[in-house]
Amino acid sequence: MDNIYSTLFGIFMGEGNRGEVVGHDEVNDYTIDTCYTIDQGWETAVWYKEYPMIIVARYPNKEMATQGHNEWVETCTTNRPTHAFSVQTDHIESFMEE
């Protein structure tokens, strides 16, 4: 983006808040998405079926984001978690309605 106005316009219009993707996988009805976001940097979001997503991790660089993404794919493949700590809310959140 060229300047602050285009950055703010992009955020307002919902553009530019999802940049480079290092992983997008669907396993056991979970979706695991790791990408660069304009507001928080590298982060992994996980959601189950159509329930709201949980931001489960943030990373300082692409390499750690890739590693973290792969770990979440493995977790959702083998453990099928029902809850996760949200780095966005600082609480343990449920992947499903209780």
Give residue ranges: language-model regions.
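Conserved aromatic
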Residues: 58-59
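Short N-terminal "domain-start" leader segments
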Residues: 1-43
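Acidic, Ser/Thr/Gly/Pro-rich low-complexity segments that form flexible
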Residues: 78-84
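Acidic-aromatic/histidine active-site loop/patch
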Residues: 65
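Short aromatic-glycine-(Arg/Gly/Cys) micro-motifs in beta-strand/loop hairpins
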Residues: 28-55, 71-74, 78
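Intrinsically disordered, low-complexity charged/polar segments
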Residues: 85-98
